[in-house]
Curated annotation (Swiss-Prot):
Protein name: Ribosome maturation factor RimP
Manganese found in the keyword field: no
SUPFAM superfamilies per record: YhbC-like, C-terminal domain (SSF74942), YhbC-like, N-terminal domain (SSF75420)
Subcellular compartments: Cytoplasm
Record's compositionally biased regions (Polar residues): 177-189
Biological processes per GO annotation: ribosomal small subunit assembly; translation
Disordered as annotated region, ranges: 167-199
Amino acid sequence: MSDKGIEIVNLLAPKVETLGFELLGAEYLLVPSGAILRLYIDTPFAMQPECMVSIDDCERVSREVSAYLDVEEPISGNYTLEVSSPGLDRRLFTLEQFARHYNQFVKVGLKLPQHGSRRLQGKIVRVEQVDGFVVLLVNGVELAVDFNNIDKARIVPDWSALGLAPLEKSKPDTKKTSQGNKKPSNESAARQAVRGVIR
């Protein structure tokens, strides 16, 4: 996450927790009309997979967080708030989240090249939280990746195991979203990808 994203997560995580959800992370994106603040929420880890986030949950959190941001004002200028479930190909924002998804495949984008590349894909085999490293098994070789050098990381779902493998190649990835009309104002919008519903 960016420094701004971390600042916003630290501010909003307690508020989201009072609503019964965990704030996994945030994206803060500058756009011509102002900015987009995208929050990823999930049910508490102990309640998964029995409980999952619904579109109604996203909308409720969006309303509450929007009102809270109007008071705290951590963002200057116009912005759009989006609240989303993580989906099957969820982003990973913290070392703890990497540890939760031990033995799963991830694709990682790096700020600076490591092991000769800025992009890696492999299985999470170990998380060294004290030293701040994620160890991935890539092509049969264990590679230690500095967590502070990770720009973005995302789970690579086993679609075949989930019974969701596409029947045809090159099909566009379609999403359903629940999102209000975007305006250049501090207006909230709740959205949820179809992939976040099927878990």
